[in-house]
Regions:
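A short, conserved structural fragment
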Residues: 48-58
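Short amphipathic alpha-helical elements of helix-turn-helix/winged-helix folds
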Residues: 17-21
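Amphipathic alpha-helical dimerization/coiled-coil segments
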Residues: 71-93
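Pre-recognition alpha-helix immediately N-terminal to the DNA-recognition helix
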Residues: 12-16
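Short, hydrophobic-biased segments on the C-terminal half of alpha helices
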Residues: 44-45
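Alpha-helical residues within the helix-turn-helix
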Residues: 28-31, 48-49
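Short, cationic-aromatic polyanion-contact patches
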Residues: 3-11, 25, 57-78
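Key DNA-contact positions within bacterial/archaeal DNA-binding proteins
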Residues: 38
Length: 93
C-alpha cells in the first residue's frame, strides 16, 4: 500500500490558494486545502510572522497580499522569490 503525499507543504498550499483568492476566509482555505481551520489559522499566522503575507481588513473580512518579492531563505533556492516559484508552478506573472 503506498502512502499519500503532497508535492507542496501545507504552507505552500495556502500561499497558492491566497494568490487566486486573496479574500478567502480561513474556513474557505481549509475546505479548499483539506486542512483543519485551526491548522490554517496557525499557518496563516506563521506566514504573516515570516513576512510571506500581509493581512488587512476589508469590511468585515480579511484580505491577504502575498509578498512576492520575499526571498526564500534556503541554500537550495538561491535568490529565488515567492514570485519565481509561483511562475514555475502556476504560470503566474
Amino acid at each position: 500500500m503506498s502512502r499519500q503525499w503532497n508535492f507542496l507543504s501545507n504552507h505552500g498550499l495556502i500561499i497558492l490558494h491566497l494568490v487566486s483568492n486573496p479574500r478567502a476566509t480561513l474556513r474557505e482555505i481549509a475546505l479548499a486545502t483539506g486542512l483543519t481551520e485551526r491548522a490554517v489559522y496557525q499557518i496563516v499566522r506563521e506566514l504573516e510572522e515570516g513576512d510571506f503575507i500581509d493581512k488587512r481588513k476589508v469590511g468585515r473580512r480579511n484580505a491577504y497580499t502575498i509578498n512576492r518579492r520575499n526571498i526564500l531563505e534556503h541554500p537550495a533556492y538561491g535568490d529565488r522569490t515567492i514570485a519565481d516559484v509561483g511562475k514555475t508552478i502556476m504560470g503566474l506573472d
